Amino acid sequence: MSAELIEKIARIPQFFMPNLNHSKDKVAFFWDITGRVELYVMDLQTKEYKQISNGEVPRALRAGFVWTRDNKNIIFAKDKDGNEKHDLYMINLETKETKQLTETPTFQEHVAHTSPDGKKLLFLSTRNGQRNLFSYDFKNQEIQELTNYPRPIFGAFWSPNNDYIVFGYNDSQNLHNGDIWIMDVDGSNQRKLLSLKDGSRDGVTDISKDGKKLAITSDFEGNSKAGIYNLETKEIKWFGDSSSEEYSGKISDDGSFLVCARNSKATVSPVIYNIESGKEKSLEFPPGIVAGTAVTKNDEFLVLTLNSSINPSRLIKYDLNSHNIDELIPIELGNLDPDFFVTDEYVEYPSTDGLTIGAILYKPKKIKLGEKLPVLVEIHGGPTGQYYRNFSMFDQILVNNGFIIFKPNFRGSTGYGRKFQDMNIEDIGGGDLEDIISGVDYLKTLNFVDKNRIGIFGTSYGGYMTFWATVKKPEIWKAGAASVGITNWKLLYDESMPHFKHYLHMLFGELDKNESLYIERSPINFVENLEAPLLIIHGTHDPRCPISQARVYRDKLLELGWKEGTEGKKTFEYREFTDIGHGGYTDQTFRVRSFKTILDFFKRRL
């Protein structure tokens, strides 16, 4: 495959975070059609759109945006080179002038919601330590701290009647719990509103137009399910049969239906429930990702994004009466042939303890009889991430270069129920590694797999697992590529922000009580076992997995006699990118550079 073709695929335009205005007749979204992510606004009736920003928004997106209540401005968060120390900005849709609202260069700030009278912004910030809720007064520019908790706040909504704010918090001894809280809009009268079970994760996704009902999601029965909570009667109405993970979304303006998302076997599809009768209305789409729960004015349309393994994302308007689909942003392939792309396959296999693991498999279209091909095992982040049957530029590049791609959703992944997701708690790098190794055993049963050419790669937790697998099961791997990965859990804890420390507590337990586990599951302590050549990629501005994670591993390799080099035994390759943080998939320039670097490595080493 030529460098030119790789670049064309890596630069297929992507759009992100479509968000309706308060009148529900326009949609704003990020789009990289120009080669850089910019902010756009489209009229849903005419489909006319205009570019709003010109370099003011981040290249690598890590935060969303909200509309002001008059629909004249959009408020977004921006960091510097991926360091995730966001400040808040407001851009006017007519003049395109940008105004900085907050300036906290060493802290994180994220928009949450706006007050219904348009006077205030609700936002999350770490400016006082832990991530808490604050309000910003647009007129006098005053900032008020609304909460001051020792654990992080998760999301918040301002009621339509301006009489309460709901938010997510956990005050339980059980770190894996999540409850719904409520307070007055000035921050007073804070209290727990709903806790279905100690240990369940309960959250709000929307408030009805009259302010009397909350759309909620909870996993108190195992699988996540959607419901409506009545603030007046305290009653909950649940929907679905709990056979699949389902997440609540938006409530229609007339309050008659709830739009949800169903996650099953690595696909996501919309489901509509009649709130009164509980009856389900499924919307039929091909396997893939059909995302979005936004309902337009007069409850006529859903605004959704569609993509599959062979089709990049497109933005559509789905008519709830006729079921017709109207494309708002079509697929932009340029002169790429759609037949070039390879369809995926969803497979299942048993792990060492009999647990069923789902995975996504790509194989080249034309495999000759008796041909044996190299395999790349691709590991997702999180560890609570999930691989879906969605379009992946890099997977298409790899499979069209003759690699088999295998993407397991190992224990700890989202999408398979709460019990499955919690199986790696205090067992990071244990059962999940066994699931991956069992996946390799499954691959070896396929007659087109070269058992001696198996590689592994991933980003974030996928980077950790690449480091970990290559030192704990060195005999399996011929090469590995770790991007923004973790090599030393204790060092990561020491360098983490308070809300990241809380997440590590959830995975490992508290450091002073479980320090031995942090040490025992760190690849840095087993480097002497490494046999496979490694590619290490890291962004110098990464706040989640700081650059020190890569540097200490590099130094340990050098200490043990390894050398930086592109060929030969006991050699590794090392790249620091000085213009990114924790990856940068939404940045086309980063995609091109990253794809070419990793592909070149595996073509040489595997």
Task: Identify the role of each PLM range.
Residues 1, 252-255, 274-277, 281, ...:
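Extracellular/periplasmic ectodomains of large secreted or surface enzymes and adhesion receptors
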Residues 1-3, 30-51, 72-73, 79-99, ...:
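Beta-propeller blade-edge and WD-like acidic-aromatic loop motif
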Residues 8, 51-52, 100-101, 145-146, ...:
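Conserved beta-strand positions that form and line the central face of beta-propeller blades
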Residues 11-28, 56-77, 88, 104-124, ...:
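Conserved beta-propeller blade repeats
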Residues 174, 200-201, 223-224, 246, ...:
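Flexible loop/turn segments at secondary-structure boundaries
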Residues 331-452, 459-460, 494-502:
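Cap/lid segment of the alpha/beta-hydrolase catalytic domain
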Residues 410-606:
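Active-site-proximal cap/loop segments of hydrolase catalytic domains
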